């Protein structure tokens, strides 16, 4: 039974993700050819903020989303109130109790609680009876998704957000299958296509690519690496990172970053990126299934 469930999970994951493992080594032209199938969909860029990494013990504190039409991959926002979703979420009693029980003195500090969703003046005005709870916001977010025509879910390191929302919705018996929607992970776009292109162009002497590559090169405990994190990539394209880790600000940053990446890929769609892409694909396949919140 366990094997059957695991096989089912693998099938669902493969069907959900547009940039799945079988597509890791596709050329830039093949990428755009595949995306034509989703050119008339509504792309929903979304992001979550949480009190921790594990949905079994942590909760959502914000959900932000913006709906857009691809428009030759420059993403025109849906101009209507129903084209945007954003709300902060009241801390659950269990979450507050966890803060109180923590051995970390910084966790109990009031500013830490403010970071996790304590209401601003704006929200006191919006919710005079208090901020909404997690269950209510999840129900509203699910309704928002269902109201959009032919949605594609777009997120940076999408498995974290998809999994977190799914697990928290399951907790409240909210009927939703996040993986029933096509999912586009911008982190995979960066790792496999964008960064492979930038490295290839930098090797050929392209000064703009060399500048971007330099901006993305970080030093870690195992040496230098090229970041696929949303903040550094956005900064490399001079996209504002103000209020990074606010859900709605992150969504706007993600949209700007994705536009810039698609423009770069369109401008060099005939470049052979297989040298670096193949190495990245090999590394991704070697990793165990999972995800890392740090890629946000």
Regions found by a protein language model. Give the residues of each.
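Charge-dense, intrinsically disordered terminal/linker segments
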Residues: 1-40, 293-296
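Conserved non-catalytic scaffold segment of RNase H-like nuclease domains
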Residues: 23-166, 227-236
């Amino acid at each position: 039974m366990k094997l059957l469930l695991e096989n089912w999970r693998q099938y669902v994951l493969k069907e959900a993700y547009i940039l799945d493992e079988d597509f890791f080594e596709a050329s830039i032209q093949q990428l755009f050819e595949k995306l034509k199938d989703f050119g008339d969909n509504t792309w929903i860029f979304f992001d979550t903020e949480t009190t921790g990494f594990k949905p079994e013990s942590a909760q959502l504190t914000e959900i932000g989303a913006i709906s857009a039409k691809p428009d030759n991959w420059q993403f025109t926002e849906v101009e209507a109130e129903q084209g945007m979703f954003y709300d902060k979420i009241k801390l659950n009693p269990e979450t507050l109790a966890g803060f109180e029980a923590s051995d970390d003195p910084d966790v109990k500090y009031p500013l830490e609680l403010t970071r996790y969703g304590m209401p601003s003046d704006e929200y006191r005005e919006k919710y005079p009876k208090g901020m909404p709870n997690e269950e209510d916001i999840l129900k509203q977010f699910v309704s928002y998704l269902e109201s959009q025509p032919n949605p594609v879910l777009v997120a940076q390191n999408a498995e974290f957000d998809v999994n977190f929302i799914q697990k928290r919705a399951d907790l409240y018996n909210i009927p939703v299958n996040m993986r029933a929607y096509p999912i586009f992970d911008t982190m995979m776009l960066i790792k496999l296509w964008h960064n492979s292109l930038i490295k290839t162009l930098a090797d050929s002497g392209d000064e703009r690519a060399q500048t971007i590559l330099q901006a993305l090169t970080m030093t870690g405990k195992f040496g230098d690496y090229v970041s696929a994190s949303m903040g550094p990539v956005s900064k490399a394209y001079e996209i504002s990172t103000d209020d990074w880790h606010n859900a709605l600000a992150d969504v706007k940053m993600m949209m700007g970053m994705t536009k810039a990446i698609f423009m770069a890929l369109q401008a060099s769609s005939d470049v052979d990126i297989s040298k670096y892409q193949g190495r990245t694909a090999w590394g991704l396949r070697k990793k165990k299934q999972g995800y890392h919140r740090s890629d946000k």
